[in-house]
Amino acid sequence: MLKTGEIAKHPRDSDLNHPSLSQTVCTALQIALVDLLKSWNIYPDSVTGHSSGEIAAAYAAGALSMYDAMSVAYYRGVVASQLLHDQPNRGAMMAVGMSAEEVQPYLDEFQPRQLVVACINSPSSVTISGDILAIDALGQTLKDQQVFSRRLEVGVAYHSPHIEQVAEQYHSLIGHIQPRGLDQITEDKRGKWPLFFSSVTGKMAPLQELHARYWVSNLVGQVKFAQSLRTLCFETNSQRGGNTGATRIRRAGAAQKPSVDCLIEIGPHAALSGPINQILQADAKLNAADIAYISILTRKTNAVTTALGAVATLVSLNYPIDFGTINRPAGTKKGRTPQLLTNIPTYVWNHTRSYW
């Protein structure tokens, strides 16, 4: 059980980054933010996620109930914790400022499956996962060649052969989840459920396919975030007729254009701001589309400020926000009419006096 005091501890004394806590806490926070945005009448047209971020994305899409989403996250933390303590060879992960194609020759210098490209974050950013000694050796090589690299604060080599040791156990623990397709969503609510673009496949995924085996692939397989986000940007409207997995046929010769105007990151920090900007800038059409990016939360910044800043960006894009709910959230007294302040200082129109 998570003690509330754990969050308030100094980072070096807190176990919040331990997988037994971090997986569940992060997903719970993301789900809460999804519900908060819905209460403000903010509904996405499409969603995608990076690694475990897909769990909350599936919840936002209506594929997973809150109970099932939290089960997927909790048991992910359980098996990761088990691997952390029982693994014969310690694992690690490292962010590298190269493309998957550029970094592969470096990985080929090691034994097969010792190091893998775990995440393709953007055209110029990947995450490498594997044996800790190999990670350290690769880091030194890249440092010598003045290539950016940074070890991540994780003790498990996610999205690598290391995870295969707990894959079947994870599947058995989450085998009870029941993903919901559009046929299980009432007719009046279907239009508000977003499309789900998978970073496991890089394509749109029908909601009913987000079953237990999918979440095993999400834990073990490569994260194709750059591909899934790019696909989302171009195919949101073309697929909007129905989230059934069937692609709407394009008119012959029709030019593919970006179909989104704003990307919102939902999580404890703007962790994907760099990769997202790199994805948008690397594609001429996406770069020209001037797609806005905002994060609901930013580390060491007041959460009210960042959340309302995100709302302000959406307002500037003419999105219909429910200001009544924002200004008078649930739990406040109802029936009280806001009072107009009439005794505040008047605006100074006389600017003839000089002060400097």
Language-model region placement:
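Flexible, low-complexity segments
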Residues: 25-44, 96-97, 180, 210, ...
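Short Gly/Ser/Thr- and Asp/Glu-enriched loop/turn motifs at secondary-structure junctions
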Residues: 89-91, 119-125, 153, 189-193
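Acyltransferase loading domain of fatty acid and polyketide assembly lines
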Residues: 1-21, 91-93, 113-121, 200-201, ...
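Short helix-loop capping/hinge segments that flank enzyme active sites or metal/cofactor-binding pockets
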Residues: 183-213, 308, 314
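Helix N-cap motif at beta-to-alpha junctions
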Residues: 100, 130-135
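Short amphipathic alpha-helices in soluble, non-transmembrane regions
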Residues: 107-109, 135-145
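Structured core elements
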Residues: 48, 95, 116-118, 127-129, ...
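FabD-like malonyl-/acyl-CoA
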Residues: 1-109, 147-157, 161, 166, ...
